[in-house]
């Protein structure tokens, strides 16, 4: 049988561990599900709606195979989009998407057919029949997957109206926001001044300097906490270097708000300092700091201009600068202490140095 019950389980101990863990509830503390879709209990009626309309990992596979963008993010027919995906997938054995897709086909549709052009029609038809009754909706899928909590990814300026509405419902799971601070720290981005203005408006703070920025961040963080948030998440290419005092960060922020150029040293100093202050805010609130390190966003400008963000145009960055990581963690630890911290790296070559580094900060007083 293709993708049988023991796929990936290579010995008896693996089976024993899986049997022990398979029925445990899932706490998904980092995902990109849209809270609006959960609130509206969005119904998925075919595999393209369920799999392809928002999964940029699958889009990368299709682009690599040469599929026209019309059948990836464009206005192509849903069935034809799935057929193009089924044509591409067999060429990517070893890619996690290959395994994910077949595991999902088995778990949710009880189908063990290989996804390929030969089986595309049967897979499409049989899944279509199973989805026709509306049972493949956002809430039913979450509940049916034994998920107890979903933590979404939300910008500090978001109003969290969907989260508040979901919280008023009687669901067997929680949907909590997470304070995603990328746009706060990315001072070099062209729209940063506009973003800071928006942040000030929603926080009720006129941001003219670094202290006002910190006040706005703190107000928005408290707003998130009031709506169930327990964590902040920051994605970055690498750890910044060099703490700056408030006056230095004032000058850097003032230049940026005036649309002036800032160099890499200014950027790093500003990011380091802002992140250190955010870390203290988190510790004071008993929150978790999540750091996603090692990603370069929107590498393909033409693709970004056509399709926007999170469409499959991101890449793995160079090896982690462990010295910078050490300096940041050590500075925060010496100045009030680290909050609970999770560090992810997208570059597998960085796992070993990062694992040894975080071991240096385990067991500190909390």
What is the predicted function of each stretch?
Residues 1-285, 334-351, 355, 359-366:
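Metal-cofactor-binding active-site regions of metalloenzymes
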Residues 288:
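Residue-level detector of anion-binding/catalytic polar loops
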Residues 295, 300:
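Hard-cation-handling environments
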Residues 304-316:
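Active-site loop ensemble at the mouth of alpha/beta enzyme cores that anchors a bound cofactor
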Residues 314-326, 346-354:
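A general structural motif
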Residues 328-334:
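Short, basic/hydrophobic alpha-helical segments
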């Amino acid at each position: 049988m293709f993708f049988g019950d023991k796929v990936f389980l290579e010995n008896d101990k693996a089976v024993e561990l899986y049997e022990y863990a398979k029925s445990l509830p899932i706490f998904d503390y980092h995902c990109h599900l849209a809270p609006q879709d959960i609130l509206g209990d969005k119904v998925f009626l075919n595999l393209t709606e369920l799999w392809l309309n928002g999964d940029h990992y699958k889009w990368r596979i299709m682009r690599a195979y040469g599929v026209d963008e019309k059948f990836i993010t464009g206005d192509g027919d849903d069935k034809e989009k799935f057929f193009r995906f089924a044509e591409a997938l067999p060429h990517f054995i070893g890619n996690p998407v290959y395994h994910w897709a077949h595991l999902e086909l088995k778990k949710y549709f009880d189908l063990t057919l290989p996804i390929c052009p030969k089986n595309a029609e049967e897979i499409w038809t049989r899944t279509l029949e199973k989805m026709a009754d509306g049972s493949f909706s956002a809430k039913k899928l979450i509940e049916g997957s034994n998920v107890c909590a979903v933590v979404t990814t939300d910008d500090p300026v978001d109003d969290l109206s969907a989260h508040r509405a979901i919280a008023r419902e009687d669901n067997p799971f929680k949907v909590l926001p997470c304070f995603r601070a990328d746009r706060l720290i990315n001072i070099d981005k062209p729209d940063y001044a506009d973003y800071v203005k928006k942040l000030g408006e929603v926080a009720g703070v006129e941001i003219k300097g670094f202290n006002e920025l910190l006040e706005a961040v703190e107000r928005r963080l408290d707003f998130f906490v009031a709506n169930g948030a327990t964590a902040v998440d920051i994605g970055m290419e690498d750890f910044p270097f060099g703490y700056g005092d408030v006056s230095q960060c004032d000058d850097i922020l003032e230049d940026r708000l005036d649309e002036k150029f800032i160099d890499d040293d200014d950027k790093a100093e500003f990011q380091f300092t802002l992140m250190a202050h955010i870390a203290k805010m988190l510790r004071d609130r008993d929150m978790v700091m999540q750091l996603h390190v090692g990603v370069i966003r929107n590498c393909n400008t033409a693709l970004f201009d056509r399709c926007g963000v999170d469409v499959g145009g991101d890449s793995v960055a160079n090896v982690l600068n462990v010295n910078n990581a050490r300096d940041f963690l050590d500075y925060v630890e010496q100045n009030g202490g680290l909050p609970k911290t999770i560090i992810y790296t997208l570059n597998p070559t960085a796992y070993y140095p990062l694992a040894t580094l975080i071991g240096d900060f385990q067991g500190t007083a909390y």
